[in-house]
A protein has these predicted regions:
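Extended hydrophobic packing segments that form well-structured cores
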Residues: 377-416
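Active-site bordering "gate/hinge" segments
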Residues: 2-273, 398, 404-406, 414-416
Length: 416
């Protein structure tokens, strides 16, 4: 048994280690992540309970010469109160100044940094799942517009919290679960490397090479085959495969997601047919994970959505507008992904989508379609919902317009 002085020292050591971890994460966010520029405004978006990382990012951003750091907190407790008591017909209302602020951030060419990882994962348990598909906050249509217009350099990263750790590792004691989650996030983000930036630059170069190979194949559509999955996803003639490194309209290079393990593009929203089974839980912020998701497509539209639980939430979201029930993104991920190698379901869109091939219902990223008439054909919507469809048992084959085929993924590995 430790003496009181030993206990106090252990607490001090733990606090010091946590501070160092948070500071390293903040440096990654403002560096190879968002790539904050001198004189730039930095907008940080977080949930209540993520204050330590916001302060560390502010410190790191100002040290890089930021002009102003703007913090925006979203409190899911307030959302819970709204969902419990507000009239149903008001749940889709978003005050105009929320969107106006985001548009102003875009017009200013600011840097945007946000963090994922639920602080209280079970807070909205018991809420009608359909209501969760109506109240989309903190997501907004304006944020999608700013992102698609490449007006800002931005980055989304994970931030471990004790509540999230207990969700991911319920088999461990709370303190052990928190430590385990931090260790995994550090490894996935390459923060355990002697030079995390150099490690990410090497990985980004690998992903860029994969995207270049895919772009050289002249593919007309993709075919997915696996357990309870037979899906064909058409591509536009101008569909362009993109990897993690991006550039804003102001010429600032950045990495939008850390981690990033994908090559992605925008499909033809009217040429998707067949059925697909999700290989990991579908995650909608604030809602319980949707398990056992199965979606059937006809002529591009999701015409049937079933799940073991929570299907009502996704159905409500897919009814929001014309493009919500169509695909806006197709992304390929292989087993080189550290997220996938961890063998852990993180219940985080950011992490889990980088563990396996995935599709997204809703808005496309227009910059993943070559400039020209095809760009206007990319899907448009007020939502963007990723769900994972890849595993070692799911094959992905590329098919050219002449019917010739090329294997893309076999046993979870790129074979192009």
């Amino acid at each position: 048994m430790m003496t009181p002085s030993q206990q106090a020292q252990a607490i001090t050591n733990d606090a010091g280690q946590l501070t160092q971890r948070v500071e390293r994460l903040a440096q990654l966010a403002v560096g190879i992540g968002a790539n904050v520029q001198p004189g730039q405004i930095v907008a940080i978006g977080l949930d209540a309970g993520q204050e330590p990382i916001s302060r560390a990012v502010a410190e790191a951003a100002y040290a890089r010469g930021a002009k102003f750091v703007d913090l925006s907190y979203f409190d899911p407790h307030v959302k819970r109160s709204r969902l419990r008591h507000a009239p149903r017909e008001t749940l889709g209302f978003v005050p105009p100044w929320i969107g106006e602020r985001i548009l102003a951030i875009g017009e200013a060419g600011a840097a945007r940094i946000s963090f994922q990882g639920p602080v209280e994962p079970h807070l909205l348990d018991g809420i009608d799942p359909e209501l969760l598909g109506i109240d989309m906050l903190p997501r907004t249509r304006e944020a999608i517009a700013v992102t698609n217009g490449q007006q800002t350099n931005w980055c989304i990263l994970p931030f471990p919290t004790p509540g999230w750790a207990e969700l991911v590792h319920p088999e461990l004691e709370p303190d052990d679960a928190y430590e385990r989650l931090w260790q995994q996030v550090e490894w996935i983000l390459r923060l355990n490397e002697p030079d995390p930036v150099a490690a990410w630059e090497a990985r980004l170069e690998q992903l860029a090479g994969i995207a270049a190979k895919l772009n050289g194949l002249g593919l007309d559509h993709l075919r997915y085959n696996g357990p309870d999955t037979e899906l064909t996803v058409g591509l536009l003639p101008g569909s362009t495969w993109i990897s993690g490194a991006m550039e804003s309209i102001h010429g600032v290079r950045f990495t939008a997601n850390l981690p990033t393990e994908e090559a992605f593009t925008a499909p033809d929203p009217r040429r998707v047919d067949g059925f697909v089974t999700a290989t990991k839980p579908l995650l909608i912020p604030g809602a319980a994970p949707i398990e056992g998701l199965k979606v059937r497509f006809e002529a591009g539209r999701a015409v049937q959505i079933d799940a073991d639980n929570g299907a009502e939430t996704l159905r409500a979201m897919c009814a929001k507008d014309e493009g919500a029930a169509r695909l806006g993104e197709v992304a390929l991920v292989d087993r080189e992904s550290r997220v996938g190698q961890s063998g852990t379901a993180f219940y985080s869109i950011l992490l889990d989508e980088n563990a396996a091939c995935h599709l997204a219902l809703g808005s496309a990223y227009p910059f993943s379609v070559a400039d020209g008439p095809d760009r206007a054909r990319a899907n448009q919507s007020s939502i963007h919902i990723d769900f994972m469809v890849g595993s070692d048992r799911v094959t992905v084959t590329g098919v050219r317009a002449d019917g010739s085929e090329v294997a893309l993924l076999r046993d979870g590995e790129f074979v192009v």
